């Protein structure tokens, strides 16, 4: 997952924040943020059925109780008020810990 976080001043959600997908009713944690849609046209046509805007932030999400990640438009997400940790096999690779209802991102070297 690319690290675009320095250019995401307009993003509503931050890396490490717990979210809830409003359409597909799952919990997850933000692993990375793209300031605008970075996927291919074919992926968008096949996967983004609700046709969310491409000109707003999109998020790489580790899905709770799953092994996959998702790529989600900001308009489909809401903050998850549960503050419960996420179970995902990549958690320890992406984050250093969990405090006060959010994950602490690992520092990435270039």
Residue positions per predicted region:
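Generic detector of isolated residues embedded in canonical secondary-structure elements
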Residues: 27-29, 60
């Amino acid at each position: 997952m690319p690290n675009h976080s320095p250019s995401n001043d307009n993003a509503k959600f931050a890396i490490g924040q717990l979210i809830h997908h409003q359409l597909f009713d799952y919990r997850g944690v933000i692993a990375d943020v793209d300031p605008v849609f970075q996927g291919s046209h074919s992926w968008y046509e096949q996967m983004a059925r609700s046709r969310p805007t491409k000109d707003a932030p999109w998020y790489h999400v580790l899905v709770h109780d799953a092994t996959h990640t998702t790529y989600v438009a900001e308009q489909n997400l809401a903050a998850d008020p549960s503050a419960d940790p996420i179970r995902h096999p990549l958690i320890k690779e992406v984050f250093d810990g969990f405090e006060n209802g959010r994950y602490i991102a690992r520092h990435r070297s270039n």
